């Protein structure tokens, strides 16, 4: 008879201490770091000033690679840099057109007021006594 295979033990296991339990306390799981890849792709495709969207895309890809490798701290750092570059890219994309629009509106209002004042000046009738 072959006894190489384990057999079922007919004896019931007896615990060494009655009521002894092992409890593991785990902290709250941290959410995985964000890489902002979609935002970086849109920033890159919009072709903003100084190629900030391209830099954001590079850091987003680095963050995703580090997350896959398991280095969550490096992924968090690269994701933070990608977020900063995305914010800068959005600001460089939105602020200059808004400033230009503000300058055009204030310039148009100033020219309208200037034209109104000059029209009033040229419509004034002078008497002959004013030239003496």
UniProtKB/Swiss-Prot annotation:
Subunit structure: Interacts with FKBP11.
Membrane spanning residue stretches: 37-57, 87-107
Parts of the chain on the Cytoplasmic side: 58-86
Extracellular side: 1-36, 108-132
Biased composition annotated in UniProt, kind: Basic and acidic residues: 1-11
Disulfide bonds: none
Primary subcellular site in the record, as a coarse category: membrane
GO biological process annotation, one example: bone mineralization
Tissue occurrence: Detected in osteoblasts and fibroblasts (at protein level). Detected in bone.
Organism: Homo sapiens (Human)
Keywords from the named record: Cell membrane, Developmental protein, Disease variant, Lipoprotein, Membrane, Mineral balance, Osteogenesis imperfecta, Palmitate, Transmembrane, Transmembrane helix
Top-level lineage group: Eukaryota
Stretches the record annotates as Disordered: 1-21
UniProt subcellular location: Cell membrane
Name assigned to this protein: Interferon-induced transmembrane protein 5
Gene it is expressed from: IFITM5
Recorded family membership: Belongs to the CD225/Dispanin family.
Upper taxonomic lineage: Eukaryota, Metazoa, Chordata, Craniata, Vertebrata
Membrane topology annotation: Multi-pass membrane protein
């Amino acid at each position: 008879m072959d006894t190489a295979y384990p057999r079922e033990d007919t004896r019931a296991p007896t615990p060494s201490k009655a009521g002894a339990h092992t409890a593991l306390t785990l902290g709250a799981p941290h959410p995985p770091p964000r890489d902002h890849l979609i935002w970086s792709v849109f920033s890159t495709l919009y072709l903003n000033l100084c190629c900030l969207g391209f830099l954001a895309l590079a850091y987003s890809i680095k963050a995703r690679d580090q997350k896959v490798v398991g280095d969550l701290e490096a992924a968090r750092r690269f994701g933070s840099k990608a977020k900063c570059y995305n914010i800068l890219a959005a600001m460089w994309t939105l602020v200059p057109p808004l400033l230009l629009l503000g300058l055009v509106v204030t310039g148009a209002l100033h020219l309208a007021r200037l034209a109104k004042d000059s029209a009033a000046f040229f419509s004034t009738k002078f008497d002959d006594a004013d030239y003496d």
